[in-house]
Design a protein with these regions (language model features):
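Alpha/beta enzyme core
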Residues: 1-19, 25-40, 49-160, 164, ...
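Short, conserved loop-to-beta-strand elements that form functional interface hotspots
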Residues: 46
Length: 175
């Protein structure tokens, strides 16, 4: 069975850190319908690290969680430079409080660090910032993270859940 699902604007390529109003409206409409007909937790992810839209949609639609790509890291990729949003998102969450979990990527796929920072520092920053879970991904969609990367993240997470964000399929799930 499935424990939870995430709804993304996966087809809105090329991704940007902001989207057109019509995309937000359509996303909200679709998410609302899915939430009304779902018995599992549902989350919101608006590509790419569009955290203000994610929080607004999650808040309005009673989502269970949001995925935050760059909570405590500054990264670069095809979407340009993406700046850490943790402090601003936490202020937004404080202004519009709701019990919505923050599931945050560590070294999010399709990007690389602008300035190198140790993994333990990144994870500690995400935890201290208020994340409810961490996401471990491979280098791109469909690519699994290494077992060593997952084990290291689990070790450093200090009990915070670690979720695999890419590459899980019938061939890799046993690992």
């Amino acid at each position: 069975g499935v424990d939870a699902a995430i709804v993304e604007n996966f087809g809105d390529v090329p991704y940007s850190t902001s989207n057109e109003l019509v995309s937000y409206t359509a996303f909200t409409n679709i998410f609302t319908r899915l939430k009304e007909n779902s018995s599992i937790p549902l989350g919101v992810n608006v590509q790419f690290n569009d955290f203000k839209a994610e929080w607004a949609i999650a808040y309005a639609c009673n989502a269970d969680f949001i995925r935050v790509e760059c909570f405590a890291e500054n990264r670069m990729g095809p979407n340009g430079i993406v700046v850490s949003c943790g402090p601003e998102l936490m202020r937004l969450k404080g202004k519009y409080p709701k019990d919505i979990c923050l599931i945050c990527d560590v070294h999010v796929k399709h990007t690389f660090e602008i300035v190198s920072q140790p993994l333990d520092f990144t994870i500690e920053s995400i935890k201290e910032g208020g994340a409810d879970a961490l996401i471990c991904t491979g280098i791109s969609t469909g690519k699994s993270p290494s077992i060593e990367d997952v084990e290291k993240m689990k070790e450093l997470s200090d009990g915070l859940p670690v979720i695999l964000g890419s590459g899980v399929n019938s061939n890799t799930v046993k690992d």
